[in-house]
């Protein structure tokens, strides 16, 4: 395998800033595809000439864009205009006119889409072999299954063919392939990523997911893709705050000794115990909890009424041409026959009751930590029993979307037998950034190479989490570094965290005063304003009141939304004060305004 340029985001940024062209990366991608020599990874590989043209069209390197020139692939149940979507069923195939919302977001950010990947048909399975096109091979061990349903997307990342990929996740399809191929799998809060242009499996439970070689890369791709899509009736507005270091102390819940399941795999049990010990050493407070209610919820996904949702998604084939479907897939979805509306409501009630039992417990932790899978499944075992091993792989994944939780799967140190180690962190909806930060703690302790490559990952240098004794404040003018009023922060013990920008929801003014002009930040219609440059400072709580006294009207402190949708305290201006002010929203940067003023 070629190892010239590791395809982590950080390595690509370094390469591009040093003069490497996106065309060189495209050539490397296609060379890797040839070397891996697994024709079952892709269901639609785009022509290299087309990608070279797209790479050339990117122009000059844009250092401010984390996805500029980053290669990726998507699961073939996600639409790309003019390219067939099959969901791994030839008779279902169609050619969409529009590209899925999430894919558009990534391409607009400069990412290069290489192709569409193989999957368990109609995203029904956790094994990756339920496809009439031939199954992709596990990137690390040919004996074990690649994991599904997002098999091709997981394997492509593990081989270092691309930097990241999109899968989908209903029962664990964005996590099991990650566990089996030594990569990261991020399953976001439901509704955070648009499902427009995605073939549904269980529409009420589906989410697009992200595979990457590192936690930081997975979260960065997720942050770019995440945006509210009014065309998706299941979309929700979520915050995607910048990834920061995990707190020095955090609470983790794990399955109790009486409820944890390893299917007799002592090596897997030892691997998980080592990870728990490492978490304890890094500041985690570990508490065991009974997972029995979660297992009951997990079993309901395929054995309860939710299988009828899969029937709805495939009804035209199931009723008109059932022989067109993969036999095991047809059998699973066909089990919906006989399910009644009464069964559905009984299922809803039971899940709600169990969720009510578990919610108070889950809420006491920063995250749950589970073995990503109880044990491994070989291709031979699956051939002998197409159903049992698949169900086992969903032990720690199937309940997550039914409870509207978020999750991230992360590699740990390799097991004693050489197979990949992996754990998954799970938390309440909206805690995606928190569990990603915790996952970096485990990632830093792993000595494994990335995926199936020989690449090593540097531990990310993440900004600190704001401590409980400080207030984070956004400043946009004379209080910034190097300006006259910065001393009012520094003399109170404030610390500069980083430069950032607001969400594009603000107007920016130079307010007329008797002396020098002052900045005025005013909120306007969402998405109709400017993204204004700010600095973020942490100021001690006991000094904040004194700082507030230094702020004259028409300025004040209020809530300011940053470009990642996180919210901090910050300077705002009364709208009436802008009537005679100069609108400098086009500059959107006080430093640029002052430089222009003195030029």
Go through each PLM region and give its residues.
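An N-terminal boundary/leader segment
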Residues: 1-56, 281, 451-457, 599
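Acidic/His- and Gly-rich active-site-bordering loop/insert found
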Residues: 51-53, 61-131
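Short helix-loop capping/hinge segments that flank enzyme active sites or metal/cofactor-binding pockets
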Residues: 67-89, 246-255, 305-359, 409-419
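Short, surface-exposed loop/helix-turn segments at secondary-structure junctions
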Residues: 93, 235, 300-302, 306, ...
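Short glycine/serine-rich loop segments
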Residues: 99-100, 104-225, 401-424
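A short helix-breaking turn/cap at a secondary-structure junction
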Residues: 187-270, 293, 437-465
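Glycine-aromatic micro-motifs
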Residues: 440-445, 450-599
